[in-house]
């Protein structure tokens, strides 16, 4: 056990009783029990086949892939996220129990990739929909890079204070109204227009076609520009 990561765990009494804080104990218990939900939409997702195999064996980190968001505390997004898929991703994130984490894997997930140059339906970065903890660039990232990202996330978990994380996730929650297309004079066929609507209800109570959620207070056109 690393005393640098958990300084309170190094205090022992003559009877060899460890004294610590509830926060450090909770973080330590979650280090080896991160259960990921694998969310893949394109080619980067194929790297998980190598990662799960015997050569890299990411089970040694306590990672157990789950098919239900209610059983997962980590979601790995890989591939391009379109406007049509964005509500589904937001809903999956909302259904995950706290504390929860996000790893954005690949150029398409982080920036929209090559599909973002002339596409009106590609989200320019998954961090406009959900908060991202670790960015993993690459096209596609190698399995070694994915393991490095998981290691960095584990270090973040070990230093985390749960109350601070909960407060930070409640800020800058923003939704958008229905999407509308308008004819423009540019060379492109249509211009994408969205209106903003601040709400306090959860996404599970709103129709999926009626909103998009992203992390910071950005203008609506930044989803696609």
UniProtKB/Swiss-Prot annotation:
<dbReference type="GO" id="GO:0005506">
    <property type="term" value="F:iron ion binding"/>
</dbReference>
<dbReference type="GO" id="GO:0045271">
    <property type="term" value="C:respiratory chain complex I"/>
</dbReference>
<comment type="function">
    <text>NDH shuttles electrons from NAD(P)H:plastoquinone, via FMN and iron-sulfur (Fe-S) centers, to quinones in the photosynthetic chain and possibly in a chloroplast respiratory chain. The immediate electron acceptor for the enzyme in this species is believed to be plastoquinone. Couples the redox reaction to proton translocation, and thus conserves the redox energy in a proton gradient.</text>
</comment>
<dbReference type="GO" id="GO:0008137">
    <property type="term" value="F:NADH dehydrogenase (ubiquinone) activity"/>
</dbReference>
<keyword id="KW-0479">Metal-binding</keyword>
<dbReference type="GO" id="GO:0019684">
    <property type="term" value="P:photosynthesis, light reaction"/>
</dbReference>
<dbReference type="Pfam" id="PF01058">
    <property type="entry name" value="Oxidored_q6"/>
</dbReference>
<keyword id="KW-0618">Plastoquinone</keyword>
<dbReference type="GO" id="GO:0051539">
    <property type="term" value="F:4 iron, 4 sulfur cluster binding"/>
</dbReference>
<keyword id="KW-0874">Quinone</keyword>
<keyword id="KW-0004">4Fe-4S</keyword>
<keyword id="KW-0521">NADP</keyword>
<keyword id="KW-0411">Iron-sulfur</keyword>
<dbReference type="InterPro" id="IPR006138">
    <property type="entry name" value="NADH_UQ_OxRdtase_20Kd_su"/>
</dbReference>
<feature type="binding site">
    <location>
        <position position="108"/>
    </location>
    <ligand>
        <name>[4Fe-4S] cluster</name>
    </ligand>
</feature>
<keyword id="KW-0408">Iron</keyword>
<feature type="binding site">
    <location>
        <position position="44"/>
    </location>
    <ligand>
        <name>[4Fe-4S] cluster</name>
    </ligand>
</feature>
<protein>
    <recommendedName>
        <fullName>NAD(P)H-quinone oxidoreductase subunit K, chloroplastic</fullName>
        <ecNumber>7.1.1.-</ecNumber>
    </recommendedName>
</protein>
<keyword id="KW-0520">NAD</keyword>
<dbReference type="GO" id="GO:0009535">
    <property type="term" value="C:chloroplast thylakoid membrane"/>
</dbReference>
<dbReference type="GO" id="GO:0009060">
    <property type="term" value="P:aerobic respiration"/>
</dbReference>
<dbReference type="GO" id="GO:0015990">
    <property type="term" value="P:electron transport coupled proton transport"/>
</dbReference>
<comment type="similarity">
    <text>Belongs to the complex I 20 kDa subunit family.</text>
</comment>
<dbReference type="InterPro" id="IPR006137">
    <property type="entry name" value="NADH_UbQ_OxRdtase-like_20kDa"/>
</dbReference>
<keyword id="KW-0793">Thylakoid</keyword>
<keyword id="KW-1278">Translocase</keyword>
<feature type="binding site">
    <location>
        <position position="139"/>
    </location>
    <ligand>
        <name>[4Fe-4S] cluster</name>
    </ligand>
</feature>
<keyword id="KW-0472">Membrane</keyword>
<dbReference type="GO" id="GO:0048038">
    <property type="term" value="F:quinone binding"/>
</dbReference>
<feature type="binding site">
    <location>
        <position position="43"/>
    </location>
    <ligand>
        <name>[4Fe-4S] cluster</name>
    </ligand>
</feature>
<keyword id="KW-0934">Plastid</keyword>
<comment type="subunit">
    <text>NDH is composed of at least 16 different subunits, 5 of which are encoded in the nucleus.</text>
</comment>
<keyword id="KW-0813">Transport</keyword>
<keyword id="KW-0150">Chloroplast</keyword>
């Amino acid at each position: 056990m690393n005393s640098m990561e958990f300084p309170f765990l190094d205090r022992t009494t003559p009877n060899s009783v460890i004294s610590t804080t509830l926060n450090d104990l909770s973080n330590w218990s979650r280090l080896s029990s991160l259960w990921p939900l694998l969310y893949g939409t394109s080619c980067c997702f194929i790297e998980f086949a190598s990662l799960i195999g015997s050569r890299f064996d990411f089970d040694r980190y306590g990672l157990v892939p789950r098919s239900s968001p209610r059983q997962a505390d980590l979601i790995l997004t890989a591939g391009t996220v379109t406007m049509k898929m964005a509500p589904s991703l937001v809903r999956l994130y909302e259904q995950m129990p706290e504390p929860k984490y996000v790893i954005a894997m690949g150029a398409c997930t982080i920036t929209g990739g090559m599909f973002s140059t002339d596409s009106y339906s590609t989200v320019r970065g998954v961090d406009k929909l959900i908060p991202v903890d670790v960015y993993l660039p690459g096209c596609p990232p190698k399995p070694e890079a994915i393991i490095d990202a998981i290691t960095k996330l584990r270090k973040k978990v070990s230093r985390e204070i749960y109350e601070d994380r909960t407060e930070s996730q409640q800020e800058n929650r923003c939704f958008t109204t229905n999407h509308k297309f308008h004819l423009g004079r540019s060379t492109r066929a249509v211009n994408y227009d969205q209106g903003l609507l601040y709400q306090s209800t959860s996404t599970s109570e709103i129709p999926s076609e009626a909103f998009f959620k992203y992390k910071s207070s950005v203008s609506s056109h930044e989803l696609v520009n």
